[in-house]
From Swiss-Prot:
Belongs to the PtdIns transfer protein family. PI transfer class IIB subfamily. Disulfide bonds: none annotated. SUPFAM superfamilies: Bet v1-like. The modification Phosphoserine is found at S119, S270, S274. GO terms for cellular component: cytoplasm; cytosol; nucleoplasm. GO terms for molecular function: phosphatidic acid binding; phosphatidic acid transfer activity; phosphatidylglycerol binding; phosphatidylinositol binding; phosphatidylinositol transfer activity. InterPro entries: PI_transfer (IPR001666), PI_transfer_N (IPR055261), START-like_dom_sf (IPR023393). The modification Phosphothreonine is found at T278. Residues 322-332 have a biased composition (Basic and acidic residues). Residues 267-332 are annotated as: Disordered. This is Cytoplasmic phosphatidylinositol transfer protein 1. Residues 267-285 have a biased composition (Low complexity).
Length: 332
């Protein structure tokens, strides 16, 4: 297990980011999706927790085979996805990632949002008070991102919001900028496979860090697109974008109808009703079936006639032990 705490500051308030993070997640997922790969939304519905109150539950499938390193692609199926389950009780969220193909792999993320510059060192005392962990600050303006994801229009050093007047962040902006908020993320990665654990857990944390950096940069760079939205408007945007994303990936309906299967209680999320099913059949596939009208191929005569022993001499057939030369014992 490898545990790290990430702190990402934003030139926003926590109340503003409630709309911004929903907008960013939907648009980012749509942009990163393509035919056969991307983020499929399986479930997105209100959810009530006895402790945290009202929230939103989402389940997604993240198809990412081409984004895996070569050493990982060699051991996973071609159609490979990670299941994401998230419980959003903003300003507190829980996100879990699992993979049925890799049962010993999981990512658990707890997120809390506060209006400060990442100065709360006790924010996760209830979750991991005595657990040793590395604290990593992510600077959306100054930290480098992978070159293939860089866009000047999404660079906080160059972008300036027309609606808020915020932007063109410079080194040290977190010390003086107002407003400012921080996303605190406690990330636990587990891959309990001997010989690969350290390598995989470190790799996953690198990917998580890159995604957090890119996503938070985009949330700010897109602020003029979502700043005036209401919650109802961003939920409608979310619904429409998710539908378009599923079509973009190429999600097809299940092979058989499963609508007659009773739904599980909302607290049980292990088998979503939209999971594809495989019809059971004892018949062989058509391409393996032998046509009934095909003539039987004869590779041998239907009857076998043996020679008459009495005619053996006249036919001049050799005996079983006959030989032109006498048999001689092998010399020792």
């Amino acid at each position: 297990m490898l545990l790290k705490e990430y702190r990402i500051c934003m030139p926003l308030t926590v109340d503003e980011y409630k709309i911004g993070q929903l907008y960013m997640i939907s648009k980012h997922s749509h942009e990163q999706s393509d035919r056969g790969e991307g983020v499929e939304v399986v479930q997105n519905e209100p959810f009530e927790d006895p402790h945290h109150g009202n929230g939103q539950f989402t389940e997604k499938r993240v198809y990412l085979n081409s984004k895996l390193p070569s050493w990982a692609r060699a051991v996973v199926p071609k159609i490979f996805y990670v299941t994401e389950k998230a419980w959003n009780y903003y300003p507190y969220t829980i996100t879990e990632y699992t993979c049925s193909f890799l049962p010993k792999f999981s990512i658990h993320i707890e997120t809390k949002y506060e209006d400060n510059k990442g100065s709360n060192d006790t924010i996760f005392d209830n979750e991991a008070k005595d657990v040793e962990r590395e604290v990593c600050f992510i600077d959306i303006a100054c930290d480098e991102i992978p070159e293939r994801y860089y866009k000047e229009s999404e660079d906080p050093k160059h972008f300036k919001s027309e609606k808020t007047g915020r932007g063109q962040l410079r080194e040290g902006w977190r010390d003086s900028h107002q407003p400012i908020m921080c996303s605190y993320k406690l990330v636990t990665v587990k891959f309990e496979v001997w010989g690969l654990q350290t390598r995989v857990e470190q790799f996953v944390h690198k990917v998580v860090r890159d995604i957090l950096l890119i996503g938070h940069r985009q949330a700010f760079a897109w602020v003029d697109e979502w700043y005036d939205m209401t919650m109802d408007e961003v939920r409608e945007f979310e619904r429409a974008t998710q539908e378009a994303t599923n079509k973009k990936i190429g999600i097809f309906p299940p092979a058989i109808s499963i609508s007659s299967i009773p739904l599980l209680p909302s607290s049980v999320r292990s088998a979503p009703s939209s999971a594809p099913s495989t019809p059971l059949s004892t018949d062989a596939p058509e391409f393996l079936s032998v046509p009934k009208d095909r003539p039987r191929k004869k590779s041998a005569p239907e009857t076998l006639t043996l020679p008459d022993p009495e005619k053996k001499a006249t036919l001049n057939l050799p005996g079983m032990h006959s030989s032109d030369k006498p048999c001689r014992p092998k010399s020792e």
